[in-house]
A protein has these predicted regions:
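Bacterial N-terminal signal peptides that target proteins for export
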Residues: 1-7
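Lipid deacylating catalytic domains
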Residues: 21-269
Length: 269
């Protein structure tokens, strides 16, 4: 009986922690703002949830860092973060294998070329294979699973209150297509991270200048130009494309501020 009681206490504490943050009872906040995180193709369901948790952690840390804590309302502290998952598809893995098998021994020169360093010649193997790869590249990034897309649409349409999407990599195609299919009054604002698309969504975008993946496919997909310095740590993320390892590490505060300002625009006097 004692063991059962202890387990019950643990469960209740765990449940309570889902609704209370920094002494704020979020159950009293009606329809709290919602951030949907849409993962890229390399992230399975569990990885997407870990990134969602990191995004949430970064946001709350940013709130705690604000010098004027009297400005921080209960609603700000009760923003909820939900994953809008899409499947990890084989075309992406196949594409990476093609690149890895083709990269010459001098990988430094290869990535210098990918980063468009002046004076570095396009590798012959890539120039010869480029046309053959175009179809694979586009299909790998633009591939959309209908069941996943419908789930996204249902999530967005069924959520009350303020909403926004943070989409990473190929997840931007899902966010864009969901808004195409949603009625105008239910469309959801999107902030794009490492987007392979060529059009900026309503809340803008963030792409690092050292993102090897986006740099590699820009000529094919028409991806938007880089607009931030990444300062990638390649031992943690050799592609410099990871949401958690690269983008939240380098620009977590910027992303958190973007969330806050989207839901609670600063008042200008």
């Amino acid at each position: 009986m004692k063991t059962f009681s202890l387990c019950l206490v643990v469960v209740l504490l765990g449940t309570t922690s889902m609704f209370v943050y920094a002494d704020v009872d979020c159950s009293s906040v009606t329809n709290p703002p919602t951030v949907f995180f849409v993962n890229g193709m390399r992230d399975d369901k569990f990885a997407a949830e870990r990134i969602r948790d990191k995004l949430k952690e970064v946001y709350y840390s940013y709130l705690d860092s604000l010098p004027n804590q009297s400005y921080v309302t209960d609603e700000m502290r009760c923003v909820q973060f939900l994953p809008a998952h899409n499947q990890n598809e084989e075309p992406w893995n196949e594409l990476l294998e093609v690149f890895l098998q083709s990269i010459p021994d001098d990988t430094v020169a290869f990535w210098q070329w990918i980063d468009l360093i002046p004076g570095v010649t396009v590798p012959e193997w890539f120039r010869n294979a480029q046309l053959a790869l175009e179809e694979t590249i586009v299909s790998a990034f633009a591939y959309i699973v209908d069941e996943d897309l419908q789930q996204h649409i249902d999530q967005y349409a069924g959520t009350l209150g303020k909403r926004m999407v943070i989409a990473h990599s190929q997840g931007n195609f899902y966010a864009t297509q969901a808004n195409v299919l949603l009625p105008p009054d239910l469309r959801i604002p999107v902030f794009a991270v490492a987007t392979p698309e060529g059009i900026s969504p309503s809340l803008g975008y963030l792409t690092h200048d050292d993102d090897h993946v986006i740099n590699a496919i820009r000529l094919v997909t028409g991806a938007l130009p880089a607009n931030a310095a990444g300062e990638c740590v390649e031992k943690d993320d050799w592609t410099c494309h990871g949401m958690k390892e690269s983008y939240l590490r380098a620009n977590g505060e910027y992303i958190a501020r973007h969330i806050l300002n989207t839901f609670f625009p600063p008042v200008l006097y």
